[in-house]
Amino acid sequence: MKKIFAITLMLLMSTLTINAQINDLTEQDIQAFKDRVGEVIDMFQNNLSILGSKKSTAKVKAVYKKSALKLFIGEGLPFKDLNDGKERPGVQMQVSKTMNGKSTVVGTKPLTEYLDNLIKLPYAEVKLTKADTYRISNIYKVGDHYEATATIFQRFEGYVGKEMKKKYGDVTQKNIRVYIVPENDYVLGQHWSVRLGDIEVVDTTN
């Protein structure tokens, strides 16, 4: 009987430890993390608008492309998965469009290729803006870091000709994998850093 009680107690303590690892964030911590994730997403959206704009020079776009890559885990290069340690080919992004009023996922591209294609789009002007407020799912702990999913709504508009006539436009709902990882540097010391991950398309509408 004592042996059974001891085993039960050990299992209970194990469960409490797991729960403590998952729920060791205060409401203030969670809100601070969500605020920081929102800031990083806004930075990414701003970078995209510069890269898509035909008013920006190639030199300026090179700077903003580098800035955009720094927001992502691996910075567009292959990286080790934080969960299983396996080598990943780099952050991937789904792209989509609407055809006959229906959402179609065109394919999945590496982040670097997506940014290069955005720069080279054959429009006289491209506008990428935030169509709605972002949403961030529950933040949960995985090993020594935290993860979450951010949902954004992005409006795309492509214009042609000197009269700047809109040729194409859509609003896409996207889910972004988010990593909140511990980092240490000489300036900030030990701190939490937000990195974005793979981006998938949920839906695209006109």
What residue spans do the PLM features occupy?
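Bacterial Sec-dependent N-terminal signal peptides
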Residues: 1-27
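Short, low-complexity N-terminal intrinsically disordered segments enriched in polar/charged residues
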Residues: 20-66
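Well-ordered, non-membrane alpha-helical segments in soluble/globular domains
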Residues: 40, 63-64, 112, 174-176
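Short glycine-rich, low-complexity/disordered patches
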Residues: 46, 50-66, 70, 128-134, ...
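A short, hydrophobic secondary-structure junction motif
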Residues: 66-80, 177-183
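A solvent-exposed, acidic/Ser-Thr-rich amphipathic alpha-helical stretch
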Residues: 71, 75-139
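Exposed beta-sheet edge and beta->alpha loop/turn motif
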Residues: 127-206
